[in-house]
């Protein structure tokens, strides 16, 4: 039986396992894991999330941060596809003071885990979404006066102050922030600061490139802009968190750590510039059936592969609907019995064929690694990206919504 789970259904399912998913106690988390393990026995594909590696990545990242710098763990896209509910006990255990999300559903899962700390949204939201998050104490990201005015009206209606992080465009993303190089931009920023019921608790920007020199240059601009705004708006510096650093910037431009950093990919082992943080996820399936084909047999749609000898093909119950791209056909390898096997023919919606002619011991039920490690062999992110012709996050965020997860230690 296929298990297709949206973020919301994952959250609901996590809540129905046991109260363990709402607890910070590790033994109770293991109880939930056992339930998930039983589910994958009836699934065609699954993800294995290594909680030990997740913890190690957090601890290693912490060791490079200034003592006074807060860490805000970015868990948008359901923790980059790894599952917020399953990772929150580790976040709480590691005493991470802030979590960043994108949607209200994600915010609810974080709060349901027992997390009482700072919770911020790292994208713009429309006013209905903001209103829906009031009871969750979500700090919003804003970058326009119109947003601030709408929030001020909501604050008055709800009789509740809304905390916000004001985005400046000094980093050059051009998607959320105010341009402080113009007089109009400065006037708008000051007007935002004066809105009743809107409390600025942070000033931030975001850098679009992995380029340390560029970051340093733009960091100087951000510092000037934020200092000007704090002074002219009569904000208390001690009440404002200045934050600009994602995973790359926090590790490679230490002077940009400021008051808070926002690591995302590095925690899950996806930071191409820093490979010392291993991936916490593996993507797996099993052999459904074996097929003996004579020489000159074609395989898959478009007959793009033809056998050159008598061959043994293993049918894998995974395809592009599970997040294994069509382009993997005739290009990618998978791991089976500790060896590499070629994907042959075009990957279908629900089926992938691999050539196991020269691999001994393959049988229905044999485990197949699509991404991750098996014995001494590895399928890594760079290999996946090359074969699929997409950036890795495009894949693992789909994996997380299309496949059940099991959490291992």
UniProtKB/Swiss-Prot annotation:
GO CC terms: cytosol; periplasmic space
Cofactors demanded by this protein: pyridoxal 5'-phosphate
InterPro entries: Ala_racemase, Ala_racemase/Decarboxylase_C, Ala_racemase_C, Ala_racemase_N, Ala_racemase_pyridoxalP-BS, PLP-binding_barrel, Racemase_Bsr/Lyr
Compartments it resides in: Periplasm
Residues reported to bind substrate: 175, 349
Keyword Ligase annotated: no
Disulphide connectivity of cysteines: 72-98
Signal sequence bounds: 1-25
Alphabetically ordered keywords of this record: Disulfide bond, Isomerase, Periplasm, Pyridoxal phosphate, Signal
Record PTM N6-(pyridoxal phosphate)lysine, positions in chain: 76
Principal EC category: isomerase
Principal localisation: periplasm
Enzyme Commission number: 5.1.1.10
SMART domains: Ala_racemase_C (SM01005)
Annotated active site: 76, 301
HAMAP family xrefs: Bsr_racemase
Protein name per its UniProtKB record: Broad specificity amino-acid racemase
Organism, scientific name: Vibrio parahaemolyticus serotype O3:K6 (strain RIMD 2210633)
């Amino acid at each position: 039986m296929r298990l297709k789970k949206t973020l919301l259904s994952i959250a609901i399912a996590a809540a129905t396992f046991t109260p363990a998913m709402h607890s910070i106690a590790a033994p109770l988390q293991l109880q939930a894991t056992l339930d998930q393990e039983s589910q994958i026995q009836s699934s065609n594909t699954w993800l294995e999330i290594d909680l030990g590696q997740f913890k190690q990545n957090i601890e290693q990242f912490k060791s490079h941060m200034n003592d006074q710098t807060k860490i805000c763990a970015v868990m948008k896209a359901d923790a980059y596809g790894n599952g917020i509910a399953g990772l929150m006990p580790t976040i709480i255990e590691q005493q991470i003071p802030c979590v960043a999300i994108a949607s209200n559903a994600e915010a609810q899962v974080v709060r349901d885990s027992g997390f009482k700390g700072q919770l911020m949204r790292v994208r713009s939201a429309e006013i209905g979404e903001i209103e829906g998050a009031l009871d969750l104490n979500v700090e919003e990201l804003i970058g326009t006066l119109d947003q601030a005015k709408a929030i001020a009206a909501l604050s008055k209606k709800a009789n509740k102050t809304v905390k916000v992080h004001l985005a400046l465009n000094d980093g050059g993303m051009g998607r959320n922030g105010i341009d402080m190089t113009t007089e109009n931009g400065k006037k708008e920023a000051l007007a935002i600061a004066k809105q009743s019921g809107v409390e600025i608790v942070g000033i931030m920007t975001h850098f679009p490139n992995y380029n340390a020199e560029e970051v340093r240059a733009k960091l100087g601009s951000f510092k000037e802009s934020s200092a000007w705004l704090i002074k002219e708006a009569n904000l208390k510096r001690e009440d404002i968190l200045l934050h600009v650093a994602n995973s790359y910037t926090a590790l490679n431009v230490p002077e940009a750590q400021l008051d808070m950093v926002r690591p995302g990919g590095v925690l899950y082992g996806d930071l191409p510039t820093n490979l010392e943080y291993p991936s916490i996820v593996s993507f797996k399936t099993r052999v459904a059936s074996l097929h003996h084909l004579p020489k000159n047999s074609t395989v898959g749609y478009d007959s793009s592969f033809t056998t050159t000898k008598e061959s043994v093909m293993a049918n894998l119950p995974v395809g592009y609907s599970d997040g294994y791209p069509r382009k993997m056909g005739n290009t990618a390898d998978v791991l089976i019995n500790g060896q590499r096997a070629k994907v042959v023919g075009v990957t279908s919606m629900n089926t992938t064929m691999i050539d196991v002619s020269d691999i001994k011991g393959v049988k229905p039920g044999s485990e197949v690694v699509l991404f991750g490690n098996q014995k001494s062999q590895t399928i890594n992110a760079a290999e996946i990206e090359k074969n699929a012709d997409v950036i890795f996050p495009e894949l693992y965020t789909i994996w997380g919504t299309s496949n059940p997860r099991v959490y291992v230690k």
